[in-house]
Curated annotation (Swiss-Prot):
One GO term of the biological process aspect: mitochondrial respiratory chain complex II assembly
Localization in the cell: Mitochondrion matrix
Organism, scientific name: Caenorhabditis elegans
A Pfam family it matches: Sdh5
Subunit description: Interacts with the flavoprotein subunit within the SDH catalytic dimer.
Protein name per its UniProtKB record: Succinate dehydrogenase assembly factor 2, mitochondrial
Record family assignment: Belongs to the SDHAF2 family.
Native organism taxonomy: Eukaryota, Metazoa, Ecdysozoa, Nematoda, Chromadorea
Principal localisation: mitochondrion
Keyword terms, alphabetized: Chaperone, Mitochondrion
Note: This protein may be expected to contain an N-terminal transit peptide but none has been predicted.
A GO cellular component entry from the record: mitochondrion
Length: 119
C-alpha cells in the first residue's frame, strides 16, 4: 500500500514538474514567452522573483527562439535557486557553462545595472 502511494506521488510530481519546469515540445513562441514570464516571477525565493521577473518583463518579448531556449535552460536547468541568486549577486562565481552563456550575461548585466550605487 505504501509503495503504491509513493509510486503514485512520484509519478504525479514528475509529471507536474515536467509541465512547469521544462521545455514543452512543440511549444509556440508566444506560449513559451508566457510560461517563462510566469516562471521568472514565481521562483520560490523572493530575490529571484524580483530579479528574474523584472528581467523577463523587459526582455522576453525581444528574445529570439534560441535565446528563449537558453533562458529556459538557465532558470529551469540544473542550478539551484540560491546558486542562481549568488551568481547574479556576485556572491559566488558561476560555473563555466553558465558564465559563457550569452543569455546569462544579459541577465547579469541587467542585474548589475539595477544595483544601487553605495554612497
Amino acid at each position: 500500500m505504501t509503495s503504491r502511494i509513493l509510486q503514485r506521488f512520484f509519478t504525479v510530481s514528475t509529471s507536474l514538474r515536467s509541465l512547469t519546469r521544462a521545455e514543452v515540445p512543440g511549444e509556440k513562441i508566444d506560449a513559451k514567452r508566457a510560461r517563462l514570464l510566469y516562471q521568472s516571477k514565481k521562483r520560490g525565493i523572493l530575490e529571484n522573483d524580483i530579479l528574474l521577473g523584472d528581467f523577463a518583463e523587459q526582455n522576453l518579448k525581444k528574445m529570439s527562439e534560441p535565446e528563449l531556449k537558453a533562458y529556459d535552460k538557465l532558470i529551469n536547468g540544473e542550478h539551484m535557486e540560491w546558486d542562481l541568486f549568488y551568481y547574479l549577486s556576485n556572491k559566488k562565481s558561476p560555473p563555466e557553462d553558465v558564465e559563457s552563456c550569452q543569455v546569462y550575461q544579459k541577465v547579469k548585466k541587467f542585474v548589475d545595472d539595477k544595483r544601487v550605487p553605495k554612497s
